[in-house]
Amino acid sequence: MPKQHKLTPLEETLEAWRGAREGVIEEAENVPASKYGFRPTPRSRTVAELLRHILEVGMMAAGELSRKDTDLHRAPWPELLALYTAPLAKATNRAAILRLLRSSIGDAQRKLRRPASGR
């Protein structure tokens, strides 16, 4: 007999997202601050750029999915990201990026748990 899930699909998604974020944080903590500017190839992102990219996509997803009028095509991708990524302006070093990785997942979960009528 299949195992019954006690979580709603939303809660399962948020739990998986938190687990994935915790893994990213653990890996980011393993990288010394002096290596956050490391770029493996000229066409690659630095460690800091990659982590900031993870943050910006998460912020945009939470922002758009918590809107009453969600529409991922309402603006070109860079413009859509810019609507939600103001907190990234201050995340320019390892400590700030790690703080934002830790705090933004909770912010996203709170947004997505709000009833649709409160969005």
Task: Locate the predicted segments by residue.
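Helix-turn-helix
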Residues: 47
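Surface-exposed patches in mature extracellular/periplasmic domains of secreted proteins
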Residues: 36-39
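Short, helix-capping/interhelical loops that line the mouth of catalytic, cofactor-
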Residues: 1-13, 56-119
